[in-house]
Design a protein with these regions (language model features):
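Active-site phosphate-binding strand-loop segment of PLP-dependent enzymes
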Residues: 4-66
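Catalytic-core regions built around general acid/base machinery
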Residues: 40-51, 71-78, 111
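Hydrophobic residues at beta-strand termini and immediately following loops
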Residues: 1-4, 85
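PLP-dependent aminotransferase class I/II
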Residues: 81-159, 163-166
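Conserved PLP-binding catalytic core of the aspartate aminotransferase-like
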Residues: 147, 157-186
Length: 186
């Protein structure tokens, strides 16, 4: 996981952007929890635009990053090749409902509408999502609780010599175990 930091490989990444293709970026990354800086993603989007390539940015966990302004959702107005994916299931605890949304230019949304799955989100899911997004105190409270609990877990894992816990900006931790895999499989 030493090369997970895109800032160290940004130019190499940009050089590999395909012409007339698409690029998927998960920010924060899953499973590492590494948050890519907004400026770096904007450079990728701009480079992709020159190659007529669409950039999909999965921001499923971005709302669970405390005090962050690294979302590129406001860049939609500047780049017609950008599409943002968001989920309400993670940030608002609606995992059983499985609901999210996408934001992008008409040039991207139009073709996506033609190939979308034939069924829409249920009424129950729509009402639950509407209620959840209107209740901002829940998200603020959740972020504070996650930060506290994540610090507790990571500090206790760090005390053990059997685990390496990687820094994460979001609500999950990537943990490397020093225990042999055969023992873990038992």
């Amino acid at each position: 996981f030493k090369t997970m930091d895109l800032s160290k490989n940004l130019q190499k990444f940009i050089m590999k952007i395909p012409r007339n293709g698409c690029v998927f970026i998960c920010n924060p990354n899953n499973p590492t929890g590494v948050l890519i800086q907004k400026a770096e993603i904007v450079k990728i989007i701009a480079a992709a635009k020159k190659k007529s390539t669409i950039v999909f940015v999965d921001e499923t966990f971005i709302e669970l990053v405390p005090e962050s302004d690294e979302s590129v959702i406001k860049q939609i107005k500047n780049f017609e090749n950008l599409f943002i994916l968001r989920s309400l299931t993670k940030s608002f605890g609606l995992a059983g409902i499985r609901i999210g949304y996408g934001v992008g230019s008409p040039q991207i949304i139009g073709p996506l509408q033609k190939i979308k799955i034939p069924w829409n989100v249920s009424n129950i899911a729509q009402h639950a999502a509407s209620a959840a997004i209107c209740y901002h105190p829940f998200l603020d409270k959740t972020c504070k609780l996650i930060k506290k609990e994540k610090n507790f877990i990571s500090s206790n894992l760090a005390k053990s010599k059997k685990f390496t816990c990687y820094n994460s900006t979001t609500n999950f931790l990537l943990v490397k175990t020093k225990t042999k895999s055969k023992l873990l499989q038992k």
